[in-house]
Amino acid sequence: MAEDDIKIVMFCCNWCSYGGADTAGTARMQYPTNIRVIRVMCSGRIEPQFVFKAFREGADGVLVTGCHHGDCHYDAGNYKLDRRMRLIYKLADELGIGRERIHHDWISASEGEKFAETVKMMVDRIRALGPSPIKKQLAEA
């Protein structure tokens, strides 16, 4: 799969991981441009249907990022995300998407380098996996 064909949707917490994206950009760190960032107020607000809609809309992978445990602006949003991610991974396997197409991580506003590394890791993983099975099904329909 050519790198230009890879599409990854990344949900970023407004208070931490979006700041990490900003830090990476401001510091001119190099990372693939295959991501489309969606800024959410809190990672705890990310519902399973958001992740699966990204796949229906043509994403090959989804990244979900939020504040480190203990740093949530809203107290426990990242703990809610932890619980939801267990469900999301299970559903991804049951739907034939595969949990390896989804990744969640904690990135603070000062971790621009971690942001860039996480994006690179995900692009490499998706390149190895090839197009999303949902994308293939939609192309055949």
UniProtKB/Swiss-Prot annotation:
Superkingdom of source: Archaea
Family: Belongs to the MvhD/VhuD family.
Matches recorded under InterPro entries: MvhD/FlpD (IPR003813)
Cofactor: record remark: Binds 1 [2Fe-2S] cluster.
EC number assigned by the record: 1.12.99.-
Source lineage: Archaea, Methanobacteriati, Methanobacteriota, Methanomada group, Methanobacteria
Keyword Electron transport belongs to the record: yes
Functional summary from the UniProt entry: Part of a complex that provides reducing equivalents for heterodisulfide reductase. MvhD may form the contact site to heterodisulfide reductase.
Oligomer and partners: The F420-non-reducing hydrogenase is composed of three subunits; MvhA, MvhD and MvhG. It forms a complex with the heterodisulfide reductase (hdr).
Keyword tRNA-binding in record: no
Name of this protein: F420-non-reducing hydrogenase iron-sulfur subunit D
Root EC class: oxidoreductase
